């Protein structure tokens, strides 16, 4: 390919020559007869549709081998054609990144006995959550995303929610480490740094503490990635003992739970995507 790129005669038709040398990825045709409303047609590519696509989101190894192979070929082909733009890609990336203040802090907000705020640094990719007692100058770090990712040793690390209990003792956090948007909830004792509740799986990520801080409320995702159930979890107990407190029967709606600003009421919201 380098020969053709440097040859004056071939330079005009370099893309045609590359297509010959580096075969354009072709998705295999597997004809299948479809019919609907008295109309019949042949679909060559319906085979790539996986009925268990949500399972693939949870575990990428379940992707059809032929589909994976085709996607990898497409990526390789694209990378080759865009290799001459790597410098401009980096330049654009650096320019956009340069407009973001990486070393930054949010304004503090007061919650019960503490002031809370977050900060980011030039060295880290994730935020740090800090707090200090209202009558103290001692700053306490209760969450560091980069350290948490390092402990888990994962490639993907998505943070869903960070919530502190009303008694300021517990930190509830939810993580997606697969990119599936199914979040796992954990409860940590801030003082001892020990995990009290190890895993509540396949949730939306939202965490709401009860006023007595004995429980949390959360929404569970079903196999179709819909949040139709709200559970109550006793902190320190096992997920299998969680109590279902609300279920939306309509598949068109999703549910969530939140606490009113005066902390007197819990709201269960059910709505469609509109």
What are these regions (language model features)?
Residues 21-274:
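Beta-propeller folds
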């Amino acid at each position: 390919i380098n020969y053709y790129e440097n040859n004056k005669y071939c330079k005009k038709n370099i893309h045609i020559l590359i297509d010959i040398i580096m075969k354009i990825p072709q998705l295999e045709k597997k004809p299948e007869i479809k019919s609907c409303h008295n109309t019949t047609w042949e679909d060559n590519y319906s085979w790539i549709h996986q009925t268990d696509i949500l399972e693939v989101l949870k575990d990428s190894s379940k992707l059809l081998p032929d589909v994976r192979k085709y996607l990898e070929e497409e990526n390789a082909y694209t990378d080759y054609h865009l290799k001459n733009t790597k410098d401009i890609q980096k330049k654009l990336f650096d320019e956009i990144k340069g407009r973001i203040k990486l070393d930054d802090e949010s304004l503090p907000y007061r919650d019960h006995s503490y002031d809370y705020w977050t900060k980011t640094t030039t060295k880290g990719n994730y935020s740090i959550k800090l707090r200090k007692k209202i009558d103290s100058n001692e700053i306490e770090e209760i969450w560091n995303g980069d350290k948490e990712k390092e402990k888990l040793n994962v490639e993907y690390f998505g943070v869903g929610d960070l919530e502190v209990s009303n008694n300021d003792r517990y930190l509830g956090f939810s993580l997606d480490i697969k990119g599936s948007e199914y979040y796992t909830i954990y409860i940590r004792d801030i003082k001892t740094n020990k995990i009290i509740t190890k895993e509540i799986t396949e949730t939306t990520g939202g965490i709401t503490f009860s006023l007595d801080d004995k429980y949390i409320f959360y929404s569970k995702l079903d196999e179709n990635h819909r949040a139709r159930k709200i559970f109550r979890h006793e902190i320190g107990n096992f997920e299998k003992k969680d109590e279902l407190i609300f279920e939306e029967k309509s598949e068109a709606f999703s549910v969530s739970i939140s606490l009113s600003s005066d902390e007197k009421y819990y709201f269960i919201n059910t709505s469609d995507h509109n």
